[in-house]
């Protein structure tokens, strides 16, 4: 009974005390602002800090051996394999590799011509159900080198071939200088065919539309387009006459040129224009440029180090400008990710080039940087940059020929139909891969040896 009375007295004493406004050993959390924005800002700062720290931490993934070109190439082979894996350039390309001329009764194979160059519409097999398409610029004189010229995503191959008045026809300049040139059509930044018309169309660019379908499958538009370039190299490698091979690109094409030359040692020299810079703010760029885990091991300088000891020319052009997703009609679903591409600054380009030069010091040719006076931008495919590319290929003979005579256009390929085929083929490839994934997973697990005492089927 006395215990019961004691408890009542203790409870009454507790009720008499004012309630505590915080737990012992703590202080009250007070702020004039909302806590959610504070939390987001803190996460933002933490991630920015981690991104900056990745640059120094990348060294743990690399074991470069500059003793000789062969030793260096062997020492970076694991890094090359990892880059190829994370961009999804892993699917077997179709064989035999053949460049096909495309034409018909109402579509001449020869689409344009100058005194020194013929231009043809072509295609080539890449994967099951996926083709590359574009233009072949064939010199009438003896061919001295072969080059894949990659436009920006919003440029047409016809522009680089001089078939569109007022455009920068740098691929034609290479062809006029004795190079066989193939200009592939890339996925562009329109949203015309992004979606399923039976369900809904979206405001996602074609690049984002394919990125979203491929990402969960371990694939990527970058990997698809790198493989498109490599399929051209396969076709050239099958020819009896062996010639130097180069890859050049501007904007999104510069990105593909950099990655393709880093992954495929058959590329003897590469030119990257309007793309190369520090990548620690990649999160600001369009989502279709994002590769899972990329910055942990690779910035542009590290990817450039995979090109060594071969020639790499960086051209400081302004690069494309993208303000965000495309404007579309109101009936479309709005779900495109934000992201911008801003013109490059010389300081950012030079800083990354210097980093690349440090990484490959003593190995082959240093990374070349072409710019205007005092770091001014140059037009993509400037004469000094193209000349440096040809020198890297070891091409003898005259310099880049000036001026260009505009070609006589016989027929203009249907660029819209070509782009629609590109989007549809890659979309179907991803969907087919998705349908086959379950059996692939089952095969993977069946090949796994269970540990003693573990019931995998349970």
State where each predicted segment sits.
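Bacterial N-terminal signal peptides
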Residues: 2-12
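Alpha/beta-hydrolase-fold serine-hydrolase catalytic core, especially in secreted/extracellular enzymes
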Residues: 17-132, 142, 212-225, 230-234, ...
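Short, low-complexity Ser/Thr-rich regulatory SLiMs
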Residues: 136-140
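Cap/lid segment of the alpha/beta-hydrolase catalytic domain
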Residues: 142-244, 250, 275-289
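Aromatic pocket-lining residues of Rossmann-like dinucleotide-binding sites
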Residues: 174, 260-261
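Active-site catalytic pocket residues across diverse enzymes, especially alpha/beta-hydrolases
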Residues: 240, 264-265
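Gly/Ala-rich beta-loop-alpha elbow adjacent to hydrolase catalytic centers
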Residues: 248-257
